[in-house]
A protein has these predicted regions:
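A structure-centric signal for secondary-structure junctions around beta-strands
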Residues: 4, 11-13, 29, 139, ...
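Non-catalytic surface loops within mature trypsin-like serine protease
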Residues: 20-21, 168-170
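CN hydrolase (nitrilase-like) catalytic-core segments centered on the catalytic cysteine
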Residues: 67, 73-162
Length: 184
């Protein structure tokens, strides 16, 4: 309904924006899965739904390097979303994040590698790190993972630009040998 649409437009969203080579907005993804959890850290309780509305759409955009699927942070814990991105044609998937220090140390690398393997996509994962108001402490690690689950480039903390070569022939070979999409 239009009333629901108006409410959606007025609420804040945690989103990922894709800007093209001309500086124009090419795609926008509003985070589907809000971080409403309790963590054994100095903050304890996180409730993104107090401040944000969840999104409604899976987003895959054409880019000069391939079809790019967009996600945000906690979305990483939902393989169904990543599967939907793959089914929509994604070849690479972004995962900008702010995992807590506790959850990031335990799960970050495992999750980014698992999503790459499951989808047979490159995962481009960047996580802020450090101490923030609230108090909130984030894990911080950036990595590029290939469709076989290998970490091609990585930065444990601090600022960095990561580069890796996308081997589309190898990606096609992996996808041809492991026909995971037909088993969904």
């Amino acid at each position: 309904s239009s009333a629901a649409s108006d409410v959606y437009k007025r609420q804040a969203h945690a989103c990922s924006l894709l800007v093209d080579e001309y500086g124009e907005l090419a795609a926008r993804y509003d985070k589907l899965h809000l971080f409403d959890v309790d963590v054994a850290d100095n903050r304890g309780r996180y409730r993104e739904s107090d401040d944000y509305a969840h999104g409604a759409n899976v987003v895959v955009a054409d880019t000069p390097v391939g079809k790019l699927g967009l996600t945000v942070c906690y979305d990483l814990r939902f393989p169904e979303l990543y599967s939907a991105l793959r089914q929509a044609g994604a070849e690479l998937i972004t995962a900008p994040a702010a995992f807590t220090a506790v959850t990031g140390a335990a799960h970050w690398e495992v999750l980014i590698r698992a999503r790459a393997i499951e989808t047979q996509c490159y995962v481009l994962a960047a996580a802020q790190g450090g101490t923030h108001p609230g108090p909130r402490e984030t894990h911080g690690q950036a990595a590029i993972v290939d469709p076989w689950g290998r970490i091609l480039a990585e930065q444990a903390s601090g600022e960095a630009v990561l580069l890796a070569t996308r081997d589309s022939a190898e990606q096609a070979s992996i996808r041809a040998r492991m026909l995971s999409l037909i088993h969904i």
